[in-house]
Regions:
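Domain-terminus/edge residues, biased toward the C-terminal soluble/receptor-binding domains
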Residues: 4, 8, 13-253
Length: 253
């Protein structure tokens, strides 16, 4: 499950139906999955696709419609790597775009916008995040005392091998970092340990800043911490979440 909560799809063509709806967050969650499939990203960047003529049909050429991916277009955006356009008279213009500036990968969703505004709105949103937020790898910072080592997405991929889904290489989503405003320090981030597997000694660390989720990391925990869990010195609920001081690890990162 991707975690969407406000969508219901009743057709595959996207045409209007009162029972066919979604929201920006759910579309962003769907768009985030594209990062898992490099082959799909490659397809999205094609400038056109041609279906050759046959005995029964003429040649059909399908051009790229996402203007941020067309170098000759005034709306071209150098960091855009994939996306999908949409329009109905009821929904107006919609646009989902994926961008990568070499440091941060983002998904932007713009809904119910008039066509002339959809590309500049998307670019402005991307530029705001790229210019005002920072991506901090947690492995480069001081580890929480409970953590033995962090497990990166590349580690998971090497251990599991390259899974194949529908003929496309599948890659785990990158984690192990936090996204913070540039004027905020990593030491101001709080964390909570969840989903601990006592057999493997692995689990997830959820990071928050000012009550907002800012990232997560997969980690292998110390024997001392695992012993605390098994002996009940740390209160852990059925989901494997450490509950301290009101349900949250009180220590700063």
């Amino acid at each position: 499950s991707l975690g969407g909560e406000n969508s219901n799809f009743v057709n595959a063509n996207g045409l209007h139906d009162d029972n066919h709806y979604t929201c920006a967050r759910d579309m962003a969650l769907i768009g985030r999955e594209i990062w898992r499939y490099p082959e799909f990203l490659k397809i999205c960047q094609e400038q056109s696709y041609t279906i050759p003529a046959s005995d029964t049909t003429e040649e059909h050429v399908f051009p790229q419609h996402h203007k941020m991916l067309i170098k000759e277009n005034k709306n071209y955006y150098q960091y855009a790597v994939a996306g999908k356009t949409g329009y109905t008279s009821n929904a107006l213009s919609t646009l989902i775009t994926m961008a990568d500036n070499g440091n941060m990968k983002l998904v932007c969703v713009v809904l119910r916008t008039h066509g002339a505004n959809i590309y500049p709105d998307t670019k402005n949103l991307f530029e705001y995040v790229f210019n005002n937020f920072q991506k901090i790898p947690v492995a480069d910072e001081k580890k929480p005392t409970e953590v033995k080592e962090f497990i990166t997405a590349s580690d998971e991929s090497e251990n599991a091998g390259s899974a194949q889904t529908g003929g496309n290489e599948y890659q785990p989503l990158e984690d192990g970092y936090v996204i913070l405003p540039k004027d905020v320090s990593y030491k101001d981030v709080d964390y909570e340990i969840t989903d601990v597997d006592e057999k493997t000694g692995e689990g997830t660390i959820q990071y928050t800043y000012d009550g907002h989720s800012v990232g997560s990391a997969t980690a292998k925990f110390t024997e001392k911490y695992l012993q605390k869990i098994s002996t009940g010195k740390e209160c852990v609920d059925n989901s494997g979440t450490t509950k301290n001081s009101g349900g949250k690890s009180s220590a700063k990162s």
